[in-house]
A protein has these predicted regions:
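Cysteine-centered catalytic environments shared across enzyme families
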Residues: 1-261
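Proline-rich intrinsically disordered, low-complexity coils
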Residues: 2, 12, 114, 135, ...
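Charge-dense polyanion-binding interfaces
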Residues: 99-122, 126-129, 365-385, 420, ...
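ATP-dependent adenylate-handling active sites, centered on carboxylate activation for C-N bond formation
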Residues: 156, 167-381, 385, 395-408, ...
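Short, glycine/acidic-rich hinge or "gate" loops at secondary-structure transitions
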Residues: 390-394
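C-terminal catalytic/acceptor-binding lobe
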Residues: 409-447
């Protein structure tokens, strides 16, 4: 079951697709220029172990993806988080596994139904947990299967998903949890900087005025973190810079304009084509700083470290899908999204017990924005109490509707291209006996208003909630044309995977 590697120089640098031949058990791995390859493993990944050993299949502390031959089987490894994934497809002759849904569909010739209106809810279902998300995307060639957090095994029995190892750690005390985080950070940082890598990597922090990124920067600075990016303005324009913490920690800061992406041509496509909400598009403004980086992010810290969280399932239930929109985009500039709060997250009940223990009271601040574990780690490293975590802010754009944030449906170039695409696919709706959407922003505004009002009145009748509460709830404002953004973005990004 040997690997055969085929370099695809024109592909995004970190993209890969493995095609396994069922008859002779050979596996051909097509890959971009930045993927590490050896005789029995390949990866674009970092993990808590020796790089040359390639044991990323034997840990849950891993970011990125790859494949490993061991004991007569192949383990395809997904990131130990739900801000990334691998996907696979099977036909009569082969299995196909890739770290890009765009790559997989381009390679196999699969297409999605452009008239399907539930991509938004299907994609967001991952926040409900590993046992409740919709595990596949229907295409013209059959189902493409999605694997979050866990690993995919291929052997003589076929393909199956296998849980990652890593449960049963002792998090009975704050000191033990902190020691675990420190040891994990130390080994991951060593792995990042290993000289045996053909393509060198370097850690890059993300700093804001909040808890999560500050905690991660404190942990990583002890083991060589030198720089970080910050978006100096949060959603709504509030100051959210992490400059104060960066100065104390001695980190070099790169200030990023949160709206810089709006100046690009068709910037939204790679983020929406990730099969996600698209809300992490703000990172496009930092692209010149991201090549060859391992981005240490705080995704899921709002649940793992929050004192008041009720999300205590070992199946990794989240509050939002933030971070997932980087899945496709990151392959192009070539960086790895390392979401540190996911380390040990399946034992969130133990972590939550620490946050609420009596011994953590000195680091528990009044109000509903208290993360005692974060505060203790940061304050004991020398950060003043008032320098971080004083007010909860958000820097990402707010989900599939965020492109309305600046008053536009999409940026002008993307809007023009998307409406043209809608017009080109009119026949798909007619084939289903349905009227196609009219490619007009004005009509979209009117139709959206009608559907929003009618659906919210129905909800009001069913819930007996005061009508003004229903009409004021932004979570129910579905935008009509937004329902079809994913197949448009997918079409555009598949062009990056020509052979």
């Amino acid at each position: 079951m040997p690997f055969r590697f085929v370099l695809q120089n024109q592909w995004p640098t970190l993209a890969w697709l493995a095609q396994g031949n069922k008859s002779d058990r050979t596996v051909t791995v097509h890959h971009g220029a930045g993927v590490e390859v050896t005789s029995d493993w390949f990866c674009e990944a970092v993990w808590d172990g020796d790089f040359q050993s390639g044991d990323f299949d034997q840990t849950d502390i891993v970011a990125g993806s790859g494949g490993r031959i061991r004991d007569g089987r192949i383990t395809f490894v997904a990131s130990g988080s739900t801000v990334d994934r691998i996907q696979w497809f099977e036909d009569a002759d082969s299995i196909y596994v890739a770290n890009s849904i765009c790559c997989l569909m381009a390679f196999t010739g699969a297409v999605v139904d452009p008239t399907y209106a539930s991509f938004i809810s299907d994609a967001n279902s991952v926040i409900e947990g590993l046992d409740r998300y919709k595990p596949s995307v229907q295409t013209s060639r059959g189902e493409i299967n999605l694997v979050y957090f866990n690993n995919l095994i291929w052997d003589e029995m076929g393909c199956r998903v296998e849980p990652k190892p890593g449960l049963g750690r002792d998090f009975s005390l704050f000191e033990k949890y902190r020691a675990f985080m420190q040891q994990s950070m130390a080994t991951v940082m060593t792995n990042i900087g290993d000289n045996a890598r053909r393509f060198s990597l370097k850690a890059m922090g993300t700093l804001s005025s909040g808890y999560d990124s500050t905690t991660i920067a404190v942990l990583a600075q002890q083991y060589g973190l030198e720089e970080a990016i910050t978006f100096h303005r949060a959603r709504g324009g509030e100051d959210d810079s992490g400059a104060s913490a960066a100065k104390i920690l001695g980190l070099r800061m790169h200030n990023i304009d949160r709206d810089a992406w709006r100046q690009r041509v068709c910037p939204e496509a790679p983020f929406i084509a990730s099969y996600s909400s698209g809300e992490d598009i703000i990172f496009l403004g930092a692209d010149r700083h991201l090549h060859g980086k391992v981005l240490l992010t705080g995704y899921h810290g709002d649940k793992v470290w929050d004192k008041l969280t009720t999300y205590l399932s070992d199946k990794i239930v989240r509050g939002d899908p933030s971070g997932l929109a980087l899945t496709e985009y990151r392959l192009h500039p070539g960086f790895i999204n390392c979401a540190v709060p996911f380390w040990g997250t399946r034992q969130i009940r133990d972590i939550h017990a620490i946050s609420n223990s009596q011994v953590m009271k000195p680091w528990d601040v009044p109000g509903n924005y208290s993360r005692p574990i974060c505060r203790r780690i940061a304050e004991e490293a020398g950060l003043p109490r008032e320098s971080f975590g004083m007010k909860k802010k958000a820097v990402t754009v707010a989900g599939w509707d965020v492109f309305h944030e600046g008053g536009n449906f999409l940026t002008p170039s993307s809007q023009e291209d998307f409406l043209e695409w809608i017009g080109q696919h009119r026949a798909a709706w007619l084939k289903h006996g349905r009227l196609p959407p009219i490619p007009s922003i004005k009509v979209n505004f009117l139709v959206n208003g009608f559907f929003m009002l009618s659906s919210e009145i129905k909800r009001w009748i069913a819930s007996k909630t005061p009508l003004w509460h229903v009409l004021g709830d932004p979570s129910y404002r579905q935008h009509y044309l937004n329902l079809y953004l994913f197949p448009w973005a997918l079409d555009r990004m598949k062009r990056c995977y020509a052979r």
